[in-house]
Amino acid sequence: MEMLEEHRCFEGWQQRWRHDSSTLNCPMTFSIFLPPPRDHTPPPVLYWLSGLTCNDENFTTKAGAQRVAAELGIVLVMPDTSPRGEKVANDDGYDLGQGAGFYLNATQPPWATHYRMYDYLRDELPALVQSQFNVSDRCAISGHSMGGHGALIMALKNPGKYTSVSAFAPIVNPCSVPWGIKAFSTYLGEDKNAWLEWDSCALMYASNAQDAIPTLIDQGDNDQFLADQLQPAVLAEAARQKAWPMTLRIQPGYDHSYYFIASFIEDHLRFHAQYLLK
């Protein structure tokens, strides 16, 4: 591992690291915020997954999460949104290829060689964080848009791994919206049954009651993608039918930007703290 940056921040440290990923077959960067130590108890971790076109720095520089994370004693880990590099398959569109990994394991050439973000987030990155930093094994997950999709599927596919999950303007039903259809047909092929494994609504309907964890979703009602790409009411209905403890908050006037995230990130951190710090 190589440290790329380090900055003092709210008595803690904001760092950026590069490491060689055996899962993704390329070098990867991630950002991490380490809160000031409180006692000898290792702090819990909140993983943040960003959206289309982003990397590990968008949340770090725009969300303003460090102040409350420092107060609460929560480590923040921000991975990149895809594998990257000259040898990594790419596409000219903003919503496919590098910067748009969709947090799944691709099965189609040429994507399958590198695009295994699900395995990276489930196994390799948490193991690396555990081995290199003084953190506890208690963790939660959150994300925005494509990253909200990622956070939800990570939680739904891994019962017991996370104490809680939250999302801002997530893509909840990718099998049925243009962003998801484009990505899934490219990364996974045309068999739509294979897509269901990566769709939060399908996973919610297939979930078991004993695996449910507290879930918070915020959605701006002035989001230009709300009707065509996001459709959170579809997941809310699935959660209702499964008696899954999910709160969906529609926030008047807010759009899809980091101004929206910055406005409510404190709520999300305090939501996760209730369960992370038990």
Swiss-Prot record:
One of its GO terms (molecular function) is S-formylglutathione hydrolase activity. It comes from the Bacteria. SUPFAM superfamilies: alpha/beta-Hydrolases (SSF53474). The active site is at residues 145, 223, 256. One of its GO terms (cellular component) is cytosol. It catalyses: S-formylglutathione + H2O = formate + glutathione + H(+). One of its GO terms (biological process) is formaldehyde catabolic process. Its EC number is 3.1.2.12. Keywords: Hydrolase, Serine esterase. It holds the Pfam family Esterase. Belongs to the esterase D family. Serine hydrolase involved in the detoxification of formaldehyde. Hydrolyzes S-formylglutathione to glutathione and formate. This is S-formylglutathione hydrolase YeiG. It comes from Shigella sonnei (strain Ss046). The gene is yeiG.
